[in-house]
């Protein structure tokens, strides 16, 4: 390179050369390519469907909904999760490639909602099954809140370090596909209903004369019929 070209190089270098690290480049490439797997089971998912319209422009963040967990890196759970659905949710999460993220949308997903008070089949929070990155409360959350949750997740991704990501992949494993749910005895024995329900007297408490008299009358009625 001769000396005549140096002034031109000095003028164009600040605008054409970018100094960065491999970690920042990896985070930047994933910010606008989050492909979510939509796991909607209740009314919260109806609010999420509003994002697909032109008013909120769901595609401007690079979010492309996928139907296969092997092509997704974000799972968005919305609605109640029951014990019967829990193994399926865990299996979907395990089939997603790394790095992967979870957004819990709605009160029913975060705490079980109104179904967790006396329901024996409702999971009290999806974070008992899979690790959650962003909690989105509401019943149901508005579409603006969903966009805010996605923005916060993008900020979290932009600050990640490669070493911390590998460490979290090994630590944030609540359950695996080999986990089996054991059926335990119910704590609801129904003893509180014994005072209200009518308890028929046993045959030992009925006098012998009345018992045989009732039995003979039933037998004669059966013979007549």
Curated annotation (Swiss-Prot):
* Family to which the UniProt record says this protein belongs: Belongs to the complex I 20 kDa subunit family.
Whom does it interact with, and what assembly results?
A: NDH is composed of at least 16 different subunits, 5 of which are encoded in the nucleus.
- Keyword line: 4Fe-4S, Chloroplast, Iron, Iron-sulfur, Membrane, Metal-binding, NAD, NADP, Plastid, Plastoquinone, Quinone, Thylakoid, Translocase, Transport
List the subcellular locations. Plastid, Chloroplast thylakoid membrane
Reaction it catalyzes:
a plastoquinone + NADH + (n+1) H(+)(in) = a plastoquinol + NAD(+) + n H(+)(out); a plastoquinone + NADPH + (n+1) H(+)(in) = a plastoquinol + NADP(+) + n H(+)(out)
Q: Which Pfam families does the record associate with it? A: Oxidored_q6
- Known role: NDH shuttles electrons from NAD(P)H:plastoquinone, via FMN and iron-sulfur (Fe-S) centers, to quinones in the photosynthetic chain and possibly in a chloroplast respiratory chain. The immediate electron acceptor for the enzyme in this species is believed to be plastoquinone. Couples the redox reaction to proton translocation, and thus conserves the redox energy in a proton gradient.
Q: Does the keyword Chloroplast apply?
A: yes
* GO terms classed as biological process: aerobic respiration; electron transport coupled proton transport; photosynthesis, light reaction
> How is the cofactor bound, as the UniProt entry phrases it?
Binds 1 [4Fe-4S] cluster.
Q: Sorted alphabetically, which InterPro entries does this protein's record hold?
A: NADH_UbQ_OxRdtase-like_20kDa, NADH_UQ_OxRdtase_20Kd_su
Q: Note the SUPFAM superfamilies from the entry.
A: HydA/Nqo6-like
Name assigned to this protein: NAD(P)H-quinone oxidoreductase subunit K, chloroplastic
Topological category with respect to the lipid bilayer:
Peripheral membrane protein
Query: What are the annotated GO cellular component locations?
Result: chloroplast thylakoid membrane; respiratory chain complex I
Gene Ontology MF terms: 4 iron, 4 sulfur cluster binding; iron ion binding; NADH dehydrogenase (ubiquinone) activity; quinone binding
What EC number is given for this enzyme? 7.1.1.-
What cofactor is this protein dependent on? Answer: [4Fe-4S] cluster
Residues that bind [4Fe-4S] cluster: 43-44, 108, 139
């Amino acid at each position: 390179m001769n000396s005549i070209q140096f002034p031109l190089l000095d003028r164009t270098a600040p605008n054409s050369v970018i100094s960065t690290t491999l970690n920042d480049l990896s985070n930047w490439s994933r910010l606008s390519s989050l492909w979510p797997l939509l796991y909607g089971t209740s009314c919260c998912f109806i609010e999420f469907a509003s994002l697909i319209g032109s008013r909120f422009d769901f595609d401007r963040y690079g979010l492309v909904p996928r139907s296969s967990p092997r092509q997704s890196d974000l799972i968005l759970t919305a609605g109640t999760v029951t014990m019967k659905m829990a193994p399926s949710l865990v299996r979907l999460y395990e089939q997603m490639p790394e790095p992967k993220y979870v957004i819990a949308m709605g009160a029913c997903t975060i705490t079980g909602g109104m179904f967790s008070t006396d329901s024996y089949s409702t999971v009290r929070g999806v974070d008992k099954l899979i690790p959650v990155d962003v909690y989105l409360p509401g019943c149901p959350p508005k579409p603006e809140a969903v966009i805010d949750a996605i923005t916060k997740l993008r900020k979290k991704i932009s600050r990640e370090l490669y070493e911390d990501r590998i460490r979290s992949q090994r630590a944030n494993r609540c359950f695996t596909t080999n986990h089996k749910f054991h059926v335990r005895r119910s704590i609801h024995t129904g003893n509180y209903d014994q005072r209200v329900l009518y308890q028929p007297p046993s045959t030992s408490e009925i006098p012998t004369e009345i018992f045989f008299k009732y039995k003979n009358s039933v037998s004669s009625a059966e013979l007549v019929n």
